[in-house]
């Protein structure tokens, strides 16, 4: 019945490797400095990982440093206040809501907005549980639009 999440089985698998690859010449400190520098330029954690992969040949920061990109950013005080995946869902909901205001009879978009907002609520519950979001944080569409406008 629930086919929405049953699709999309094709993906790459990370190699099971404990240490850093042989071709990476950067040290642990240099990689941490690169992560910090890219974060100060305004890149998100996922974009930092993509830049390190494509431009510096670092397949996975955790293999070299022993910490994830977000852990490095949290230590340096550069981590985003709202986790990146939640923020991307909020941005998507704002865009769909803007579309619905322009085309109010678009029932498919309304259904999509309901699904996006339910994902936001589930993810919010998870992040409150692990302590990444304060307990009083609530998703509000009006505030979300201001949040997305301020981040752009």
UniProtKB/Swiss-Prot annotation:
Cellular component terms per the entry's GO annotation: cytosolic small ribosomal subunit
Gene Ontology molecular function: small ribosomal subunit rRNA binding; structural constituent of ribosome
Swiss-Prot/TrEMBL keywords: Ribonucleoprotein, Ribosomal protein
A Pfam family recorded for this sequence: Ribosomal_S15
Disulfide bonds: none
GO terms, biological process: translation
Keyword Ribonucleoprotein in record: yes
Entry superkingdom: Archaea
InterPro entries associated with the record: Ribosomal_uS15 (IPR000589), Ribosomal_uS15_arc_euk (IPR023029), Ribosomal_uS15_N (IPR012606), uS15_NS1_RNA-bd_sf (IPR009068)
Matches recorded under PANTHER family: RIBOSOMAL PROTEIN S15P/S13E (PTHR11885), SMALL RIBOSOMAL SUBUNIT PROTEIN US15 (PTHR11885:SF6)
NCBIfam families: PRK08561.1
Summary of subunit composition and partner proteins: Part of the 30S ribosomal subunit.
Stated family: Belongs to the universal ribosomal protein uS15 family.
Protein name (database record): Small ribosomal subunit protein uS15
